[in-house]
Amino acid sequence: MGDDVRVTWRRVRESWARSAAIELPLAVPAQPPAPGCLRVAFLVYRGNPQCGGQGVYTRHLTRELVAMGHSVTVFAGQPWPQLDPGVGFVPLPGLDLYRDPDPFRIPHPRELHDLAAAVELGVMLTAGFGEPLAFSMRARRVLRSRRGQFDLVHDNQCLGTGMLGILGDGWPLLTTLHHPITVDRQLALGHATTPWQRATTRRWFGFLRMQTRVARRLPAIVTVSRSSATDIAAQMGVAPERMTVVPVGVDHTVFRPQPDVAAVPGRLMVTSSSDVPMKGLVPLLEALSLLRADRDVELVVVGKPREGGRVDRAIERLGLRDVVRCVSGISDEELARCYAQAQVAIVPSLYEGFSLPAIEAMACGVPVVATTGGALPEVVGRSGETGVLVPPNDPLALARAIAGLLDDPAARARLGAAGRDRVLDRFTWQVTAMGTAACYRALLDTGPPEGGRGVRGGRHRPQVAPCATDRSLVTSAAKGAPC
């Protein structure tokens, strides 16, 4: 017992030392807006693109908005975002309680300098996730000190209670809701095997009550697929007329075919930003085990499965250590090269609100095998034409689809080319930015938020058409805007 206490205390002190050594990034001023363009405060509570789709969305959308002439300042918590030149940045540091190498750390008392920090720690100590609430409190406080500096606020799925305060302070607020996290909770509960796991899972997802309550009161929501819009309305009770579908995109100058890079025979690739049941890695590993019975295959996992977690245990149980390789922390250019070296890319998710990995692979000209979970059919397209679709959580169907492509070079080439054409036609960040900017204009044309005090700063805003919900309308609305 005494040894355990000493070890714990040593780890706490080591964590404190690491915290003391961390230097906060400097704020970066935003590029001023072009005439007639907007000043946007963009909020993201977790901004690093290597931690998930929210960070990728933040980086590429803000870059394209700035290219259109808008001025964008990103207010972000840890892990910090990667931003392009011209995009402003204001760090809103939290306690970063889940960082490597000391997740669920106990912060030094000096770090508890405000109510938001106390809330963040208190929620973690009761097995919950307090980052969205704490970040929304910090964001509201900072925006109160910047009245008149922005025309609107864009929240990237924080949905903390502080967002209602931001609305009440008079800020026009647009929110991106990628998909309802209620789906994540349902899948996590379905994979919990003990009463304790079910109890802790419910507690961890306790923030969903707050997000649902906030979402129902938001004036304007952007979501990324028709599937997500349907699920948000059904599971969170958001009025459909408040939602607009603007798909996300891919940087097709980075994610492109590389004819000088040879695909490795039998190599498969999957990208997974988190080690959770929803990503479907265990069914994919079971499919890989079936494929090994009559062929040489290997799987590259772009992600970091948790040591001793479900994926790690499945690799061990199925005897796949020698054919599964995990890589993480790589650049977009390195990721594109990984796609080029694969014969088939797989998206085995049980559910996706969109799927950046699917369109990244398609943009690279790599044939995709995906499930029908969530928005994947909407993204990948018709099975057999621009990709191959199979039921979710079906290892045998996955194995058969993958084997069919591995055995048919002509089909791989045909689907790869058709997939890239589909992405270039529908899913680029330029289209995403134009559609988002059209939604900004529509929001501002509605006047100050109900109960707000009007802090926009008096800038003239030309009129535009209402937000569109498909690519052709999004493009035409954006082209009609002066920016």
Language-model-detected regions and their locations in the chain:
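Conserved donor-binding/catalytic core segment of Leloir-type glycosyltransferases
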Residues: 261-288, 300
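A conserved catalytic-core segment of Leloir-type glycosyltransferases
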Residues: 2-20, 26-37, 75-138
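Nucleotide-activated donor-binding/catalytic signature segment of Leloir-type glycosyltransferases, i.e.
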Residues: 311-333
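Short hydrophobic beta-strand element within catalytic cores of glycosyltransferases
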Residues: 367-370
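Aromatic "clamp/platform" in nucleotide-sugar-dependent glycosyltransferases that forms part
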Residues: 350
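Conserved acidic donor-binding segment of nucleotide-sugar-dependent glycosyltransferases
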Residues: 382-383, 388-395, 404-409
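Carbohydrate-associated surface elements
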Residues: 227, 249
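Acceptor-binding helix/loop patch of EC 2.4 sugar-transfer enzymes
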Residues: 102-126, 167-212
